[in-house]
Design a protein with these regions (language model features):
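Conserved Nudix-box catalytic region and its N-terminal flanking loop in Nudix hydrolases
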Residues: 7, 44, 51-53, 60-99, ...
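Residue-level detector of beta-propeller blades
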Residues: 11, 17-18, 114-117
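Acidic, metal-coordinating catalytic segment for phosphate/diphosphate chemistry
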Residues: 14-53
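Short, well-ordered beta-strand micro-motif
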Residues: 28-30, 54-56, 136-138, 159-161
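Short, acidic, Ser/Thr-enriched surface-loop or helix-capping motifs
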Residues: 33, 59-60
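Active-site segment of metal-dependent pyrophosphate-handling enzymes
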Residues: 47-48, 62, 71-73, 81, ...
Length: 195
């Protein structure tokens, strides 16, 4: 095993929050580099995120993938995505994705047949401290109840075939994390014969 101690930076004072927003904080950290030089490094402290690939099992559903469409301010476009959202304080990733699916797509928990964790990863460890956890959720039938959206959330539920999701994943605006979730789902399906 490699000795990473010669690559580590050491903090020499408490981090200072330089910007606080409703969804993340920007923090300056003063650290000593391995060569002994001091520097200030920027970190974004953000909540953990969750997402889920949700499928419907009923045989007559060709459009079995449940996705959401909503306006994304970062790209100023309506994006189609897998249900996703922030993990609230004190909430587990699993509880968070179940809550988000209830809110966004009207998921009826009694219709869940299977839940599997696909992956957990840091979206950008260069300057972010949060984690993204993605699940696969299989539901029986339509799974629909009433949406329970947050204030200022405008989300439309959409159903897609496998090939339609493939097309969405090829868009340059689709997030890396959504693309990775889809790739992990497809890999498990092809290599393991199922999720």
């Amino acid at each position: 095993m490699a000795d990473d101690s010669k690559l580590k930076f050491e903090s020499w004072n408490d981090p200072q929050t330089v910007l606080h927003t409703p969804i993340f904080d920007v923090v300056n950290e003063n650290k000593k580099a391995p060569d002994g030089k001091n520097g200030t490094y920027v970190k974004i402290k953000a909540p953990n995120w969750v997402s889920a690939i949700v499928t419907r099992t009923q045989a007559d559903f060709c459009e079995r993938f449940v996705m959401t469409a909503q306006y994304r301010h970062g790209v100023n476009k309506v994006m189609e995505e897998f249900p996703c959202g922030m993990v609230e304080e004190g909430e587990s990733p699993l509880d968070a994705i179940l809550r988000e699916c209830e809110e966004e797509i009207g998921l009826d928990r009694s219709k869940i047949l299977q839940i599997t964790k696909l992956y957990e990863s840091n979206p950008n460890p260069a300057f972010m401290d949060n984690r993204m956890t993605c699940y696969y959720i299989e539901v029986e039938g339509t799974c629909r109840q009433q949406q329970n959206l947050d204030e200022n959330e405008f989300i439309e539920v959409r159903y897609h075939t496998d090939s339609q999701v493939e097309s969405i994943m090829k868009s340059p605006d689709t997030s890396v994390m959504m693309k990775y979730a889809w790739a992990e789902y497809k890999s498990r399906l092809l290599n393991l014969g199922g999720i």
